[in-house]
């Protein structure tokens, strides 16, 4: 069972979620537009890592 979060903590987590989502979207976009395969794969990895962090943060709010 997770402890109750304060309103300030919820706002902080929500802000972090917005940032993680934004970076994941940007990295996904870059992975599709880069012509260098190595850089494109690195951007895919970065996007995946940020998506995982987003999911973890979402889990804290549920």
Feature map (PLM): residue ranges:
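His/Met- and acidic-residue-enriched segments that coordinate or traffic transition-metal cofactors
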Residues: 1-62
């Amino acid at each position: 069972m997770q402890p109750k979060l304060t309103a300030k903590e919820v706002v902080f987590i929500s802000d972090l979620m917005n940032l993680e989502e934004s970076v994941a979207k940007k990295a996904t976009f870059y992975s599709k537009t880069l012509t260098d395969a190595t850089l494109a794969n690195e951007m895919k990895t970065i996007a995946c890592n940020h998506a995982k962090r987003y999911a973890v943060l979402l889990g804290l709010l549920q």
